[in-house]
C-alpha cells in the first residue's frame, strides 16, 4: 500500500465517538453561536485524544454548521489546543517580557539540555513536550512554567530535575 493511499484511508476512517458528539451537542445550548461552541468542542476532542487532528476539525465544523477554516482558526489561536500529538506531560514555559527579565532563558536552556529536545518537540520516550507560551498570568512570581495544569513559580534550573520527577 503506498503512503498516499494509507494517509487517505486513515483520514476517511476517523470519526468522533458518540460520546464526543453528544458532549458537543450539549454545549450548543450554552452559547449564542456555533463559533463560540467550537472552543469547547475542540477541548472535548482533545481531552479524549490528546490532540486535535485535521479530520476532527472537519467533523466539528460539520456538527456546528461552520466552515472548517473557522474551527481551524479557533484551534490555532489558542495555545492549549494541540494540532499535533504531544507527550504525556506538556511543559509550557512563559516567554513574556517579565519572565525574560527574570531569567526564563536559563530555564528554557536547562529544559532543552536536560530533556534533549528543542522547543516544540517531544522527548523520545513521549514523556514531555516543551512549548512556549506568551504569558501564564503569573508575572509577579516569574519565571514561571506550567506542567499540564500545574503552575510553578520563582524557578531556577536547580529546581527543575526534582520537579520533572513528579511527572512519570
From Swiss-Prot:
The keyword Iron-sulfur applies. It is an enzyme of class 7 (translocase). Gene3D superfamilies: Glutaredoxin, NADH-quinone oxidoreductase subunit E. One of its GO terms (molecular function) is quinone binding. SUPFAM superfamilies: Thioredoxin-like. [2Fe-2S] cluster binds at residues 94, 99, 135, 139. Keywords: 2Fe-2S, Iron, Iron-sulfur, Metal-binding, NAD, Quinone, Translocase. Its cofactor is [2Fe-2S] cluster. Its EC number is 7.1.1.-. Composed of 13 different subunits. Subunits NuoCD, E, F, and G constitute the peripheral sector of the complex. NDH-1 shuttles electrons from NADH, via FMN and iron-sulfur (Fe-S) centers, to quinones in the respiratory chain. Couples the redox reaction to proton translocation (for every two electrons transferred, four hydrogen ions are translocated across the cytoplasmic membrane), and thus conserves the redox energy in a proton gradient. NCBIfam families: nuoE_fam, PRK07539.1-2. This is NADH-quinone oxidoreductase subunit E. It comes from Buchnera aphidicola subsp. Schizaphis graminum (strain Sg).
Amino acid at each position: 500500500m503506498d503512503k498516499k493511499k494509507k494517509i487517505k484511508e486513515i483520514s476517511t476512517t476517523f470519526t468522533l465517538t458518540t460520546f464526543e458528539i453528544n458532549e458537543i451537542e450539549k454545549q450548543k445550548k450554552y452559547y449564542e453561536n456555533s463559533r463560540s461552541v467550537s472552543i469547547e468542542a475542540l477541548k472535548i476532542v482533545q481531552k479524549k485524544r490528546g490532540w486535535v487532528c485535521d479530520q476532527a476539525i472537519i467533523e466539528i465544523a460539520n456538527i456546528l454548521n461552520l466552515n472548517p477554516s473557522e474551527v481551524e482558526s479557533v484551534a490555532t489561536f489558542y495555545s492549549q489546543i494541540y494540532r499535533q500529538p504531544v507527550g504525556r506531560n506538556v511543559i509550557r514555559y512563559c516567554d513574556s517580557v517579565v519572565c525574560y527579565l527574570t531569567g526564563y532563558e536559563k530555564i528554557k536552556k536547562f529544559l532543552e539540555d536536560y530533556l534533549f529536545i528543542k522547543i516544540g518537540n517531544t522527548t523520545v520516550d513521549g514523556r514531555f513536550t516543551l512549548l512556549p507560551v506568551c504569558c501564564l498570568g503569573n508575572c509577579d512570581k516569574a519565571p514561571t512554567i506550567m506542567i499540564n495544569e500545574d503552575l510553578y513559580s520563582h524557578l531556577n534550573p536547580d529546581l527543575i530535575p526534582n520537579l520533572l520527577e513528579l511527572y512519570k
